[in-house]
Swiss-Prot record:
GO terms for biological process: translation. One of the primary rRNA binding proteins, it binds directly to 16S rRNA where it helps nucleate assembly of the platform of the 30S subunit by binding and bridging several RNA helices of the 16S rRNA. Forms an intersubunit bridge (bridge B4) with the 23S rRNA of the 50S subunit in the ribosome. This is Small ribosomal subunit protein uS15. Disulfide bonds: none annotated. PANTHER family: RIBOSOMAL PROTEIN S15, BACTERIAL AND ORGANELLAR, SMALL RIBOSOMAL SUBUNIT PROTEIN US15M. GO terms for molecular function: rRNA binding; structural constituent of ribosome. It holds the Pfam family Ribosomal_S15.
Amino acid sequence: MALDMAKKKEIIAKFARDSKDTGSSEVQIALLSQRIADLTEHLKANPKDHSSRLGLLKLVGQRKSLLSYLKKTQYNRYAKLIGELKLKDR
């Protein structure tokens, strides 16, 4: 479930720190969160799609590690990001 280019550019523009920023932790976490939301909707409609479920778990693990890195290095940006994405602070 890939993101279309328009949605991806919109997310990058919203969470980027400057105009050329496409790979910061915030952008990566926001993109992963959107892909996780899309896969979650797909799995609600297709509960027997086990390969997508495994992909979802992999994405959640990637997001978790990026969030822990951001929390450890720059807590202010972490707190702002989880507020915007409506994620739980763990």
